[in-house]
């Protein structure tokens, strides 16, 4: 049904339901109003206060000074007509010059201005005759010192008085990174990398380790090198001339924050201050055979660039992409339909596998108590003169060879086990068509998965690539065999931590061997029984892979089969970087101290990735070892990798952050989303080492330390026990997120969560990019009957479906006549109130009674009315992603329906009591206040 977007202020045509059921104001609890997503941080702190983002105290602009020095007249003369007027520095949202609201004494006159004066004295901007030759358009002509830059102001908010928390804050960008004018060499108003690529827990960096320690805030980077599954969905500029300028000492790459010296012949590194020669080809276009405009080079204008690397960056020529599929053919995988569904999905996705240069290779290995190898015929083996070449019925039958020695597996033949995808596509399709019939009558319950992975590794060790394991059986024979250890009596006790650790050293040690030979292992696990996810997930964790868990999966359920087929097809289609390493550099006195994520640590500062996934992020903890004297510091992540098309490239991500010696500056620029991501990774580490209880204690202790520091050093006066709970506005969602983490399935105190589910959750918590991690911790909660008229319809300008606003995750909003959607990014629940009106049920489900509403895993029917279409559009939009493979299941939950399903849905309402957690979010905040004042 085609829909027109209603004009602003008008209502679209829709069925009229009883007024009391669909009146927004009538349904909300007293005193509650929907948060306004357009409000800046701090908007609810005080109507008259200087808001985080207020415009009344913005410092006056200073002229831009190009970041160059030591001019030599006549060199790189600017072309005629180059503007010479000053450029106003960018004013980021949230810059305010007045006293900090709520803490006038703490933010005295020296705050933000005089506190930076001495730092700015160290900033070499223009003094001594700046190099003006070839200055970028818009650069100022005079040499002078720019005015000190005002940093973010700190604003207090009362967490208990301003309740419930405004969850629209979760979608706001991080606090602005405010750099001094002229910090960019080209005058680009926004040279910093987007926070989607790199964000820091502290957007103002403390100048000393003592200040960092005093703040109790974590100092870490959250890095996501790729923001889309495919290059076409990214917009990263490429430097293709292989002219790469790097510092001779620290090996950092030239970027928008360097300084050109001596008439542009040399450049000063912004990391270590060493002066380097500019490469001879830097100002020359070898392709067009003419000089180039230096200031148009991508690496001087953009902080995320990709260099095409010359031959010296290669240890060996880029290898082809290789996929080896290890398929479980034991009786359980045959009966639940995994083998047939996997074979069909692989066949349908062969054309989606990256194969730009026709070099991609594939192989197949089936496993039960033996190993089944398949020799696939090549195109030249097809008989000539028997029809058109490539027809499926012209390909010879693949040969199967069985190896029963699972303790020391070997390759039964040297060739034809790993074949070219383009040359052998017909033979591959023929094999995939026949796999189900080959093992249809098996009764073998055993699985030698560990031995199969060893055999697959032998097959591709000299090339590298991916081993893709699809299994629904606990590995119970051969190398790395496991036993059932799902002790329900241990759940929720101190012994539960042992069940989250690997039961066999094989899976970690062999993952390290895989990483050394550029092999990644990905696990797709399907079972209604115990599968020891804790042990099996070690293979992906230390080989830069991922664990995908499908509990209770069965192909006869269309929703299960559809979810796996969609996700696996997306997985196969994502573009891969291979033979990759990641190194993060920064200024003198700053060191990367700890790394979190799925990879192999080759050295203290080098992370190795056999293949670089597109849907994961990484956390890097930072130490300050020396006092920082610079007015700003720079972090640079470099990823050396090979592309699927056979090019060696370096993706470079650079971000600069101001520094300060004032505690209030550090708190005012702290990023609550990045801090939560860091805490989640630390809690996962603690849970895997000690258990969920220790993880919960870690989260609670870190939060209490921040509140204690804030009260002691940043609150205006010492107040009594009846005082409110104050915190800085830009961190006001941090307690909510920590509360949600403590109640999350990965850490929650309960005896009802199987260890496999908890282990799979820990895998996600340690790898999800921050926007999906926050949603996984604090799900999106939509009220589908009290939503704007435009929600669920295409936007008139963008054509994108408009989503309804989110509301707080509390059961007080689950009105009995309502319809609600809970979405944590992995699963969705459509909640139907027990008193839902027949007209609503008819429009959404096509039934007239609540008892007729189908519950459980399902999809909405397609009905000929606008409300049904809007709900389906919202669900489809929630599933729409270009940077992840996840396709959420939809569970319909009736308020008066199955108790287990209802309980599962309500555990996502993390502002309420959840199982044994025992406290609401309001009580959680009250307990923090009592602890502070005790």
Curated annotation (Swiss-Prot):
Keywords: Cytoplasm, Cytoplasmic vesicle, Endoplasmic reticulum, ER-Golgi transport, Golgi apparatus, Membrane, Metal-binding, Protein transport, Transport, Zinc. It comes from the Eukaryota. GO terms for biological process: COPII-coated vesicle cargo loading; intracellular protein transport. Gene3D superfamilies: beta-sandwich domain of Sec23/24 (2.60.40.1670), Sec23/Sec24 helical domain (1.20.120.730), Severin (3.40.20.10), von Willebrand factor, type A domain (3.40.50.410), Zn-finger domain of Sec23/24 (2.30.30.380). It is a peripheral membrane protein. Zn(2+) binds at residues 247, 250, 269, 272. Residues 247-272 are annotated as: Zinc finger-like. Pfam families: Gelsolin, Sec23_BS, Sec23_helical, Sec23_trunk, zf-Sec23_Sec24. The keyword Membrane applies. GO terms for cellular component: cis-Golgi network; COPII vesicle coat; endoplasmic reticulum exit site; endoplasmic reticulum membrane; equatorial cell cortex; Golgi membrane. InterPro entries: ADF-H/Gelsolin-like_dom_sf, Gelsolin-like_dom, Gelsolin-like_dom_sf, Sec23/24_helical_dom, Sec23/24_helical_dom_sf, Sec23/24_trunk_dom, Sec23_24_beta_S, SEC23_SEC24_subfamily. CDD domains: Sec24-like (cd01479). Residues 1-56, 70-89 are annotated as: Disordered. It is found in: Cytoplasm; Cytoplasmic vesicle, COPII-coated vesicle membrane; Endoplasmic reticulum membrane; Golgi apparatus membrane. GO terms for molecular function: SNARE binding; zinc ion binding. The keyword Cell inner membrane does not apply. Its main location: cytoplasm. The COPII coat is composed of at least 5 proteins: the SEC23/24 complex, the SEC13/31 complex, and the protein SAR1. Golgi apparatus membrane; Peripheral membrane protein; Cytoplasmic side. Component of the coat protein complex II (COPII) which promotes the formation of transport vesicles from the endoplasmic reticulum (ER). The coat has two main functions, the physical deformation of the endoplasmic reticulum membrane into vesicles and the selection of cargo molecules. PANTHER family: SEC24-RELATED PROTEIN, SECRETORY 24AB, ISOFORM A. Belongs to the SEC23/SEC24 family. SEC24 subfamily. This is Protein transport protein SEC24. It comes from Yarrowia lipolytica (strain CLIB 122 / E 150). The gene is SEC24.
């Amino acid at each position: 049904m085609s829909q027109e977007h209603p004009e602003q202020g008008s209502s679209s045509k829709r069925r009229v339901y009883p007024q009391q059921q669909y009146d927004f104001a009538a349904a909300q609890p007293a005193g509650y109003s929907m948060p306004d997503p357009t409000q800046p941080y701090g908007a609810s702190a005080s109507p008259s206060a200087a808001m985080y983002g207020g415009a009344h105290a913005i410092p006056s602009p200073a002229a831009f000074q190009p970041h160059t020095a030591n001019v030599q007249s006549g060199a790189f003369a600017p072309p005629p007509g180059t503007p010479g007027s000053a450029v106003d520095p960018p004013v980021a949202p949230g810059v305010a010059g007045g006293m900090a609201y709520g803490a006038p004494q703490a933010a005295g006159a020296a705050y933000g201005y005089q506190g930076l004066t001495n730092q700015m004295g160290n900033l070499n901007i223009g003094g001594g005759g700046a190099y003006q030759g070839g200055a970028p358009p818009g650069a100022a002509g005079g040499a002078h010192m720019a005015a000190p830059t005002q940093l973010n102001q700190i604003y207090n908010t009362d967490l208990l008085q301003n309740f419930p928390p405004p969850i629209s804050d979760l979608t706001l960008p991080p606090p602005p990174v405010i750099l001094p004018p002229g910090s960019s060499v080209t005058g680009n108003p926004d040279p910093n990398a987007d926070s989607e690529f790199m964000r820091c827990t502290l957007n103002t960096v403390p100048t000393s380790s003592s200040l960092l320690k005093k703040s109790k805030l974590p100092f870490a980077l959250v890095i996501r090198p790729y923001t889309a599954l495919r290059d076409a969905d990214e917009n990263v500029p490429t430097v293709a001339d292989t002219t790469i300028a790097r510092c001779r000492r620290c090996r950092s790459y030239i970027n928008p924050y360097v300084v050109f010296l001596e008439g542009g012949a040399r450049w000063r590194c912004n990391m270590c201050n060493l002066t380097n020669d500019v490469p001879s080809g830097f100002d020359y276009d070898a392709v067009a055979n003419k000089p180039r405009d230096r200031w148009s080079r991508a690496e001087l204008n953009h902080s995320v660039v990709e260099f095409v690397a010359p031959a010296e960056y290669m240890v060996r020529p880029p290898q082809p992409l290789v996929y080896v599929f290890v398929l479980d053919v034991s009786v359980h995988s045959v009966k639940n339909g995994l083998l047939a569904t996997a074979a069909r999905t692989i066949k349908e996705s062969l054309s989606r596998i990256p194969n730009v240069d026709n070099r991609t290779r594939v192989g197949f290995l089936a496993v039960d108590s033996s190993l089944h190898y398949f020799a696939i015929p090549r195109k030249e083996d097809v008989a000539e003169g028997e029809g058109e070449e490539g027809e499926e019925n012209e390909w010879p039958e693949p040969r199967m060879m069985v190896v029963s020695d699972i303790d020391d597996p070997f390759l039964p033949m040297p060739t034809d086990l790993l074949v070219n995808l383009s040359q052998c596509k017909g033979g591959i399709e023929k094999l995939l068509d026949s796999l189900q019939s080959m093992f249809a009558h098996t009764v073998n319950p055993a699985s030698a998965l560990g031995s199969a992975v060893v055999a697959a590794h032998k097959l591709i060790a000299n090339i590298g690539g991916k081993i893709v394991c699809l299994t629904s059986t606990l590995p119970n024979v051969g190398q790395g065999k496991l036993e059932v250890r799902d002790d329900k009596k241990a759940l929720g006790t101190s012994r539960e931590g042992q069940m989250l650790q690997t039961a066999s050293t094989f899976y970690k040690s062999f993952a390290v061997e895989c990483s050394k030979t550029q092999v990644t292992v990905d696990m797709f696990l399907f079972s209604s029984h115990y599968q020891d996810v804790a042990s099996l997930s070690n293979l992906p964790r230390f080989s830069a892979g991922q664990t995908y868990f499908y509990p209770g999966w069965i192909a006869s359920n269309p929703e299960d089969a559809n979810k796996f087929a969609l996700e696996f097809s997306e997985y196969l289609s994502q573009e891969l970087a291979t033979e990759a390493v990641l190194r993060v550099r920064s200024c003198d006195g700053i060191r990367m101290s700890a790394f979190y994520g799925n990879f192999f640590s080759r050295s203290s500062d080098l992370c190795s990735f056999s293949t670089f996934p597109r849907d994961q992020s990484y956390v890097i903890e930072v130490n300050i070892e020396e006092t920082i004297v610079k007015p700003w510091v720079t972090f640079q992540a470099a990823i050396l990798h090979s592309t699927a098309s056979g090019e060696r490239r370096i993706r470079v991500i650079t971000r600069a952050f101001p520094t300060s010696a004032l505690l209030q500056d550090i708190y005012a620029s702290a990023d609550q989303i990045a801090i939560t991501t860091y805490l989640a990774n630390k809690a996962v580490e603690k849970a895997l080492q000690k258990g969920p209880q220790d993880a919960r204690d870690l989260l609670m202790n870190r939060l209490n330390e921040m509140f204690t520091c804030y009260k002691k050093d940043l609150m205006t006066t010492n107040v009594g026990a009846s005082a409110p709970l104050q915190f800085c506005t830009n961190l006001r969602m941090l307690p909510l997120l920590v509360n949600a983490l403590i109640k999350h399935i990965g850490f929650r105190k309960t005896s009802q969560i199987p260890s496999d589910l908890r282990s799979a959750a820990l895998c996600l918590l340690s790898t999800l990019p921050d926007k999906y991690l926050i949603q996984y911790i604090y799900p999106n909660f939509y009220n589908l009957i009290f939503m704007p008229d435009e929600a669920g319809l295409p936007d008139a300008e963008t054509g994108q479906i408009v989503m309804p606003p989110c509301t707080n995750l509390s059961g007080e909003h689950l009105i009995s006549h309502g319809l609600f959607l809970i979405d944590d990014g992995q699963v969705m629940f459509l909640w139907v109130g027990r008193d839902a009106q027949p007209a609503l049920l008819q429009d959404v489900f096509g039934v007239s009674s609540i008892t007729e509403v189908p519950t459980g895993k399902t999809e909405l029917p397609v009905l000929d009315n606008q409300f049904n279409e809007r709900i389906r559009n919202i669900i489809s939009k929630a599933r729409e992603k270009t940077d992840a493979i996840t396709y959420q299941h939809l569970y319909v939950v009736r308020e008066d329906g199955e108790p287990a399903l209802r309980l599962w849905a309500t555990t996502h309402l993390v502002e309420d009591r959840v199982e044994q957690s025992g406290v609401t979010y309001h009580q959680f905040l009250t307990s923090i206040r009592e602890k502070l004042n005790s």
